[in-house]
Amino acid sequence: MSRFTWIQTGALALSLIAAPAAFSQTKKAADGAAEWPMFNRDLGSTRYSPLAQISTKNVAKLARAWSYKVGTQKNSGSITGGSEVTPIVAKGVMYLTTNTDVVALEPETGKVLWTYPASGPGNLSRRGVAYWPGDTNNPPRVIFTMGRRLIGLNAKTGKVDPGFGNEGEVNMGVAYDSPPIVYKDTLVVGANTGEAPSVGDPGNTRAFDAKTGAKKWEFHSVPQPGEFGHETWEGESWKNRSGVNNWGFSLSVDAERGIVYTTFGGPNTNYWGGDRHGDNLFANSVVAMDAETGQRKWHYQVVHHDVWDYDLPPAPALLDVVINGKKVPLLVQTAKTGWMYILDRVTGKPVFGIEEKPVPQSKVPGEQTSPTQPIPVKPPALARNSFKADEIVTAADTNEEHAKFCRDLMERSGGFTNEGPYTPYTYREAGAAPHSTILFPGSIGGVNWGGVAADPKLGYVFVNSIDEASIGWIEKKANGSAVQYDRNSVVGPTSRFQWSEGNPRSGNIQGSGEHAWPCQRPPWGRLIAVNAKTGDFAWSVPLGVTDELPEGKKLTGRLNMGGPMVTAGGLVFIGASNDRRFRAFDSRTGKQLWETKMDMSAHSIPITYQGKNGKQYVAIISGGASALDDPAPPGTEALMVYALP
C-alpha cells in the first residue's frame, strides 16, 4: 500500500554513513570505497562499506565530529512525522534534503557549499536525493522528488539544470517520496498512492532517461488484460486498482545482468479484499525486470490476497555466497510478514525452501482469503507471529501498572484470538460485543522499510525486527464510507500502555510516543544476524532499552524504524530504536561495543565515508518527530556525524 496504514505507533528517521571520494588518499578511496553514492550505498543495496579505520578495537572512542540541523518539523503524531533522509556522498560532497531545502555540504566539516530552496507543488522528499555522474554533454546532477515532480539540479552549483526534462523538471504522473535509483543512464522510481479507496492512482514502477528526463518504460503493478498475472484479479477488480506500489525508499539492480528488482505492497484496501478475489499479482511481490525495457523476468509473491497490510517495503539485498561448494547469486528480501525470503536472484527460486502452508480462513462476508501462504523453511521467523494468553506482559517483566493495563485491554477487547501466522481479523456484527484478533506481526511489521545490511565477505545479513501487534476486528462501514469493511478496535489506532512516572495514564489514551509499551512480554525489538550460507541465525540480541524500568529489566528491545549498515571494520551501526540511541555492534558476535544518546531517535539508515583528510566518518539523521517518539522541540532534527578523535 502506500506507507503505513492502521498503525499502533510510528516514527521514522534515517541512519546514515556517508562516504566522500578522497581523491589523493588511498587506493581504496580512488576505487570509490570512500563514498556513499546512493541510498543503500551500492546498486545491490548491501549497505556494506569496505572502510575499516573505525573497527571493533577502537569504536568505543567514537565521538561527535559535527552536526547540521535539518528542520524544525513538529511532532505529527503519525508514523511519517520525522526526517527519513539518508545523505549521500559523491565526488567529495555530501548531498541531502532538509525539511525545506536541498543542500550540499563539505563532508569533513558540515560547511554549506550550496542550498536550493525547494518551492512549488508537492512535498520535498524526506528521504534524500540521487546522484547521476553526467556525461560529455550534461553536468553531474542531483535528482530528487517533490510530489509528482522529478527535479534535476547541477551538482556543482545547486541550480536547476534546464537540460533535464522541461526546464529541469519531469512529471512522473504519480507522487513518489523517495530518490530514484540510478543505473547507467536510467532513473527508476516507485509510487506513493493512498490507502483508500480501492480505486485511484496506479502503483506502477516507472523509468526515465537520466539525460533527457524522457519516460523509458512503465511496469503495470496490476496486470492489464492480456498481461501475465491478469487472471489473479477476478472479474473487473483490476480496473483502476490502487495500492500495489513500491512506496519504499529504493530499488536494487544486478548491474552484471542488467536486472532491476522492485517490490510491491498490498492492494487497496488494506483489510478487506471481498471486491478483489484472487491472489492479486503483483501485490506483495518482488519482481525482477529488465532494467532497459521493464519486461518481467520473474516474480515471487510472498503473500497471496493480502488482508493484513503485509507490504514489502525495503529493497532486496544482493550478494553472492558459496553454498555446498557453488557460488549462488542471492536476493534477500524482508517484509512486514516477519520472514526473510532468500531467493536465487537469476531464477527467483527459493534457496533454502519455501512451503505453501494452510492458514486460518476469514469469516468476513464476501471475503475469500487464500487457503495457503508461502512460509520459508529457513531462516526462522525474524519476529513474533503468534500469541498465547500466558504471553501477556507481567509485573515481573516491567511493572504492575503496565501488566494491569494489558489485562484490562484484553478484557475490554472481548478477549484475544490468535491462530498463528496469518490469523484473519474476526468479524463483528453491528451491535455485537467486541471480540478481537491479536495479530503478530502487526501492520508495521515484522520488518519495515529499514530492510537489511549484508556483509559479502562474512556472508551475514543483518536486520532489525519489530514485535508489535495489531488488535481489532473487521466491521461493515456506513454507506458513503471509502471502504465497505474496515478494521476497528476498542482503543482506536493504538493498543499500547502509556507510562508516565508516578502517574500511569488510563487506557483510553492513544498509546504513542517513547513511553508507550506493547502488551506482550519482551523483547519488543531485535537485531539479528542471518548466515546467508546456511539460512541459520548467527546471533540475535534485543535492540533498545526502556529507561524507565529498573536495572535488570531495561533491556526490553524497543519499537524501531530504520535500518543497519555494516563495515569491513567488523561493525554493524544502527539507530532505529525509539530510545534516542545510536549503536555499534560486533558483526560476528552481536556484542554491543558503542552507543551514544541523541536529542531525537534516529529512524533512518546510517552511512559511513572517508573524508579528503583521510578520516573515516559515520553519520545518521536524528529525526524522531512521529508517533514512535515524544514531541520534539523545534530545531532538534539533525544530521549527526561521528569520527575517532
Labelled PLM ranges:
Residues 8-19:
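Bacterial N-terminal signal peptides
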Residues 36-40, 80-100, 123-149, 176-197, ...:
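Repeat-blade elements of multi-bladed beta-propeller folds
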Residues 431-467:
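Segments forming glycine/polar-rich beta-alpha architectures that bind adenosine-containing cofactors
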Residues 1-5:
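N-terminal secretory signal peptides that target proteins for export/translocation
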Residues 198, 217, 261-263, 270-271, ...:
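Short helix/loop capping segments that flank catalytic or ligand/cofactor-binding pockets
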Residues 58-71, 102-123, 133-136, 149-173, ...:
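Extracytoplasmic/lumenal domain signature
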Residues 26-73, 86-89, 111, 528:
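Mature N-terminal segment immediately following signal peptide/propeptide cleavage
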Residues 23-54, 370-407:
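N-terminal pre-domain segments of enzymes
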